[in-house]
Amino acid sequence: MDTSHGDTRPGQDVRKWCVGVAVDTEGGKLYWTQKGPGNAGDGRIFRANIKIPKGQSPANRTDIELLYQKLPEPIDLDFDLANRTLYWTDRGDPPRGNTVNRAPMDAGPGAKDPEIVYNHLMEGIGLALDIKNNRMFMTDLGGSLYSCNLDGSNKKVLLFAKGNLTGVAYVEFPAK
C-alpha cells in the first residue's frame, strides 16, 4: 500500500506503523497508536468506526479521525469508558515521553494537551487499567512492573529490572 500521499493507514512509512490497539465496543470505535520514528515527536493516536462505512473499503474509508498528534512515541492504550478518558504509554524522550498520559476520548480540534499521570518509565510499553479499583499497571523495556492510581498518585514498583517486559493485562475473575 502506498502511504506517501497522506494515507493514515499502516504501510511502509514508519510514521504509519500501528503499535497499540484498543476497541471500544460500547461506542463502536477502534483506537490505535502510530508511534512514528524513534524520538521524533511524530506519534499520533487515531480512531475509526469498527464497521467500515457502507460503500467504502479499508483503502478508501473516510471515518478515520486524528485525535492527538506530535506525541513522542505512543505505544499501548486503554480506556476509562465511564469517564470517556483515554490512557496510553509513551516511550519517547522526556519530558513528555517515558510516561503514562491521559486525555479525553472525544477531544476535538483545539483540545488541551494530554495530562502526564506517571513518568520516569524506562521505555514504557504495556498498560492495563483496573477501573473498579482505581488503579493502573504499566511495564517497561527496563523490565519493571509499576502500579498507581488512575490520577497517578500512590505509585508503586511491583517488579524491578526483571528483563524486557513488553505488555501487561489485568483480568478480574468474578467470585464463585
Residue ranges and their predicted role:
Residues 26, 35-40, 50, 82, ...:
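Short loop/turn segments immediately following the C-termini of beta-strands
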Residues 2-4, 9-15, 65-72, 116-122, ...:
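Surface loop/turn motifs at the tips and blade-to-blade linkers of beta-strand repeat domains
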Residues 31-33, 47, 87-89, 102, ...:
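Residue position within the beta-strands of beta-propeller blades
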Residues 39-49, 95-103, 144-147:
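Structural motif
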Residues 141-176:
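Blade-level signature of beta-propeller repeat domains, shared across WD40, Kelch, NHL, RCC1
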